[in-house]
């Protein structure tokens, strides 16, 4: 879990992906399990305007009651289409399309149940059950040292893609790699052991190394994991898994 901020300083919680494929990586303690619906995150800033997590205005939501919510109507594509255009939809969004996410105020429609020390196998099975019903996966929330940690349980696909460029990070990542570009989208997050072949550990060190070596890496192949391909053929939420020095061709699951 990470506490992130919008451009005006409004804070919100971002869930971290739980690596349920790793048998050594488990979630401990009593947890509450929720549906992760495949919508668009919408957050009210300090003056009440509705922004995306990238601090971009989201239209057609001002009449809805929420502070930090997932907006969802029928599918991610339909929701994205509504919030991505200036002209109002034929049928306005309603409160039924709003799923509040704040701790203590979470929409009861999202709640599945609780568990003690859930196994990765059980989480995977539950994830696939709800994906079959149209959800994106699960969110597991667990109290830890007075805070509520958010873990997302989502499926992964893998692809080997050619690196086409690098973008410098901002704020704490200034002077480091912010994202790695490919023809299929940009990877802005890095798996913890993505540079284990180079004995580089820690997000800051990984981003520093990538930025320092960016010129020699352009044209090389990186392995990314992602959720799915969009209708435009882009990868949703790609993350760097490792550099593929043994390959020079692209491939997809």
Please identify what each model-predicted range represents.
Residues 25-107, 252:
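Covalent nucleotidyltransferase
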Residues 49-56, 182-190:
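Catalytic Cys-His active-site segments of thiol-dependent hydrolases/isopeptidases
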Residues 75-97, 185-253:
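Intrinsically disordered, low-complexity regulatory tails
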Residues 3, 110-158:
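Amphipathic alpha-helical
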Residues 1-47, 165, 187:
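RNA/tRNA-interacting regions in translation and RNA-turnover enzymes
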Residues 156-172:
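Structural detector for short beta-strands of small beta-barrel domains
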């Amino acid at each position: 879990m990470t506490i992130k901020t919008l451009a005006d300083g409004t804070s919100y919680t971002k869930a971290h992906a739980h690596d349920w494929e790793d048998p050594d990586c488990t979630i401990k303690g009593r947890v509450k399990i929720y549906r992760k619906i495949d919508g668009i995150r919408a957050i009210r800033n300090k003056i009440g305007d509705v922004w995306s997590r990238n601090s971009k205005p989201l239209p057609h939501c001002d009449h809805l009651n929420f502070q930090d919510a997932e907006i969802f109507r029928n599918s991610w594509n339909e929701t994205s289409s509504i919030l991505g255009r200036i002209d109002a939809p034929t049928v306005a969004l309603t409160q039924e399309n709003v799923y509040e996410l704040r701790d203590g105020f979470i929409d009861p429609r999202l709640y599945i149940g609780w568990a003690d020390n859930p196994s990765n196998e059980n989480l995977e099975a539950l994830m696939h059950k709800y994906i079959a019903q149209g959800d994106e996966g699960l969110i597991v929330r667990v109290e830890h040292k007075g805070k509520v940690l958010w873990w997302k349980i989502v499926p992964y696909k893998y692809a080997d893609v050619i690196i086409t460029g690098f973008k410098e990070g901002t704020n704490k990542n200034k002077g480091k790699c912010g994202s790695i570009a490919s023809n299929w989208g940009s990877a802005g997050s890095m798996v913890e052991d993505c540079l284990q072949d180079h004995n580089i550990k820690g997000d800051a060190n990984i981003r520093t190394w990538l930025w320092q070596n960016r010129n020699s890496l352009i044209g090389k192949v990186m392995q990314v994991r992602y959720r799915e391909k969009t209708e435009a053929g882009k990868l949703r939420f790609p993350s760097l898994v490792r550099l593929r020095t043994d390959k020079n061709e692209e491939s997809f699951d």
